Amino acid sequence: MSVSYKGTISKTHSVFKPEKGRYYIYGALGCPFTHRAILARSLKKLEPVLGLVLSHWQLDSKGARFLPAPHRPEKYKERFFTATGGIASAKLDESEELGDVNNDSARLFVDGAFDPVENISRLSELYYLNDPKYPGTKFTVPVLWDSKTRKIVNNESGDIIRILNSGVFDEFIQSEETNVIDLVPHDLIDEIDKNIKWVHPKINLGVYKVGLAENGKIYETEVKTLFENLQKMECVLKENYKRLEEQFSGNKQKILAKYFVLGQRLTEADIRLYPSIIRFDVVYVQHFKCNLKTIRDGFPYLHLWLINLYWNYAEFRFTTDFNHIKLFYIRMEVSRNKINQFGIVPLGPKPDISRL
């Protein structure tokens, strides 16, 4: 059982007020729900304001863990205020050969980071710092942590996106771009919420319903439901593309500049969908047996949307770590027990992401 924390940050809040360097996101780079929060942080130019602490890629029976702190940990402080919390492999566009990487590998800022805030070794410790009588048995990411009060503000990725988008940290941002991207524009909020209501259960969670199915009948039902909804999204994006094609007389550059899920603007709808789709061919097709089609070969408009975000928006490209994505799923203890006993990480597909 997991417990949700639903706090927010605002100038009028009695406890959680905006402050530079006070709050941190704890998460796992391979986790799609953490990825949402990291994307929002980067797109809102909040890296200098909001720290990011990323765990080791393996989730074992005790949950997420962090690496031991190095000698003179203070000299690494700036790394936690970068797009990927200092993890080096996020700059690679291709996963490496991972067969000789053991689960106890502890390469600093490669396999994960240490915790510079509370110096904990397990994410569970953060939950118990927040509440010594924490009633849950699961310790989920992402976590938005207040280092001043040593309390969890929020651990729901969707809420964290909206907190970061609210403008509460804008006064601390130097970049003129901070007000350009509104991830939840007022005129699209109803459409965004409507989109979330089917994308979240049918696609974001749908891949897990397929991959963790415990009998063939359930698997077949869930995999068909998943692909029906991928096709639904394909139709949405096809319609968007055709409309843009007419508007811009086939000018590909202008089309791609407006090619998003909703309203010709980059919104929360794109942020919620991207982490699932970027992981699809790389992990879900083979590991979760979501194998009726691949994105690259079976959904041309969805695939174009994906590679457009990856190659044309640095925030998407440099928060996507194919090494961590593969290791996170393949070496997860529940995967070893139920899906891939020997934890063998597939080399393919190649490339991990097609060129635009």
From Swiss-Prot:
One of its GO terms (biological process) is glutathione metabolic process. One of its GO terms (cellular component) is peroxisome. It comes from the Eukaryota. Keywords: Coiled coil, Oxidoreductase, Peroxisome, Transferase. It holds the Pfam family GST_N_2. Disruption phenotype: Null mutants display increased sensitivity to cadmium in the absence of GTT1 and GTT2. Null mutants also show growth defects on oleic acid-based medium, indicative of abnormal peroxisomal functions and altered expression of genes related to sulfur amino acid metabolism, and have low levels of reduced glutathione. It catalyses: RX + glutathione = an S-substituted glutathione + a halide anion + H(+); L-dehydroascorbate + 2 glutathione = glutathione disulfide + L-ascorbate. This is Glutathione S-transferase omega-like 1. Belongs to the GST superfamily. Omega family. Its EC number is 2.5.1.18, 1.8.5.1. The keyword Transferase applies. Residues 214-257 form a coiled coil. Induction: By diamide and 1-chloro-2,4-dinitrobenzene (CDNB) in a transcriptional factors YAP1 and/or MSN2/4-dependent manner. Its main location: other. Active as '1-Cys' thiol transferase against beta-hydroxyethyl disulfide (HED), as dehydroascorbate reductase and as dimethylarsinic acid reductase, while not active against the standard GST substrate 1-chloro-2,4-dinitrobenzene (CDNB). The active site is at C31 (nucleophile). It comes from Saccharomyces cerevisiae (strain ATCC 204508 / S288c) (Baker's yeast). The gene is GTO1. GO terms for molecular function: glutathione dehydrogenase (ascorbate) activity; glutathione transferase activity. It is found in: Peroxisome.
